[in-house]
């Protein structure tokens, strides 16, 4: 974990990089069209980027404001920035090949096909053209390094340079993103209806989020300990809201699909025991198939399987058997399955098999926070690892990345540090009384965290907050382009800041 109170001595001023993040409406549903994170945008709103300066000759490289994991740290040689072509190319959705005999790298994406030969300053295209680079491609510990200008001048990506932190910011082209939302656990202050339809229930207004969403997962059903399903009031809060038919009708009017979502866990459902009993398991599958008749599809959200290592294999087998039964009963009705990521503590999910039997997987790549060590809920390294592990086993076009619209707030009092709360994105900065603050450190977006960091001290102790907002949510949504996956699902509607639909621009 970075300590920004110490790091600020070496950082100098926080960087404000000129990158525009625009969320554009698209003519054809269903998807958001996220404009590229474009350098040199018009001034609208400024935010701070908190970036640790790279030490010469090295440089930082960010794609759409998120880090790029490089096996060899990019560096400057003879005045030119050298970057690993495989790491950056694959992050941009290209296929990279290697001919070891001739020492030739192939770069392929869509209609673009390039041949780069180690030791030369030329590039061959598939149509026979020869292009020049300012610096020869080279091998460094088995990694091919090429001038960054290959991506900016030849491939046409927008690139910005920040001298204060020796950082390169690359913007990928605009592409549509398929967005889903969880319609669950709503309240007066955090209303799913208001986030989705733009006004207080039962009213709607335009523009609203529903105009650009593929669908919602209606978290209105809970599996009880006896294996029965209820949509009435229960301890988990997964229940039908009053006026729920209006949600379905209004969603249909906006061409938004509505999937019924069924939640279970160990604490409230003892889901492992239910799945282990063949009769209960079969009855549960039948009940869900009947309840799902009035919906466009089903999302199964059975959480906590395999937390006990001794039961991981049996949980996996039993869950597979349940999905088999349910899939047969549903017929042509689509079935999605929410899963914990492979790099989590929950090992009771057969990801490869689920990826085959389900129409899609919702990858819950968050919840990585520690209860006593200040950490964000979904930092880049964990999310990046989770998605890459998933698409090794599952078709990327079946993977929906679930992203959190909430952060984490920690308090340190004396020698005790604890997770205080998980503030929703729409709350903005943590509220505090100025006359109680002893020391305040500037809020800023940290690419490694994929969220904002804010720290202050008051009479209660030291506060460390990892906060989501419109910018961080858009950065997370853009990750779907990097991995070539189906789309993203926001947990949850009711937490989203209104400006997630508005253009936000970062200026120097």
Go through each PLM region and give its residues.
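Acidic/aromatic/glycine-rich contiguous surface patches that form carbohydrate-binding/processing clefts
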Residues: 476-508
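Glycan-binding loop/region signatures in secreted carbohydrate-active enzymes
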Residues: 405-478
């Amino acid at each position: 974990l970075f300590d920004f109170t110490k790091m600020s001595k070496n950082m100098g001023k926080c960087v404000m990089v000129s990158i525009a993040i625009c969320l554009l409406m698209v003519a054809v549903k269903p998807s958001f069209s996220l404009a590229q994170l474009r350098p040199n945008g018009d001034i609208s709103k400024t935010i701070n980027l908190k970036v640790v300066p790279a030490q010469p000759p090295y440089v930082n490289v960010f794609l759409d404001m998120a880090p790029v994991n490089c096996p060899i740290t990019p560096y400057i040689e003879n005045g030119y920035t050298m970057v690993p072509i495989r790491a950056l190319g694959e992050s941009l959705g290209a296929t990279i090949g290697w001919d070891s005999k001739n020492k030739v790298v192939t770069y392929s994406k869509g209609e673009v096909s390039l041949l780069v030969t180690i030791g030369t300053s030329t590039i061959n295209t598939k149509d026979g053209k020869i292009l020049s680079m300012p610096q020869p491609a080279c091998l460094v510990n088995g990694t091919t390094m090429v001038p960054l200008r290959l991506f900016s001048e030849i491939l046409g990506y927008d690139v910005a340079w920040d001298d204060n932190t020796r950082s390169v910011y690359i913007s990928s082209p605009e592409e549509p993103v398929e967005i889903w939302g969880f319609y669950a656990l709503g309240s007066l202050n955090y209303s799913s209806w208001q986030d989705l339809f733009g006004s207080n229930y039962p009213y709607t207004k335009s523009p609203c989020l529903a105009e650009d969403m593929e669908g919602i997962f209606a978290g209105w059903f809970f599996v009880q300990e006896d294996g029965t399903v209820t949509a009435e009031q229960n301890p988990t809060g997964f229940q039908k809201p009053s006026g729920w038919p209006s949600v379905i009708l209004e969603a249909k009017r906006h061409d938004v699909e509505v999937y019924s979502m069924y939640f279970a866990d160990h604490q409230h459902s003892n889901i492992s025991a239910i799945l282990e009993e063949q009769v209960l398991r079969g009855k549960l599958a039948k009940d869900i198939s009947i309840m799902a008749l009035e919906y466009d599809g089903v999302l199964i959200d059975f959480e906590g399987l395999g937390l006990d290592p001794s039961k991981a294999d049996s949980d996996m087998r039993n869950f597979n058997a349940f999905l088999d039964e349910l899939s047969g009963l549903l017929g042509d009705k689509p079935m999605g399955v929410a899963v914990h990521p492979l790099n989590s503590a929950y090992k009771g999910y057969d990801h490869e098999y689920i990826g085959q039997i389900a129409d899609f997987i919702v990858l819950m790549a968050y919840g990585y926070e520690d209860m006593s060590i200040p950490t964000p809920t979904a930092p880049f390294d964990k999310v990046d690892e989770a998605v890459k592990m998933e698409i090794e086993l599952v078709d990327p076009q079946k993977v929906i990345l679930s992203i959190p619209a909430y952060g984490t707030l920690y308090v340190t009092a004396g020698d005790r540090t604890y997770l205080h709360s998980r503030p929703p994105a729409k709350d903005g900065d943590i509220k505090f009384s100025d006359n109680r603050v002893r020391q305040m450190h500037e809020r800023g977006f940290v690419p490694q965290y994929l969220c904002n960091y804010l720290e202050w001290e008051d009479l209660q102790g030291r506060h460390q907050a990892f906060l989501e907002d419109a910018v961080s949510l858009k950065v997370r949504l853009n990750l779907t382009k990097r991995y070539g996956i189906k789309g993203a699902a926001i947990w949850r509607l009711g937490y989203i800041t209104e400006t997630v639909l508005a253009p936000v621009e970062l200026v120097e």
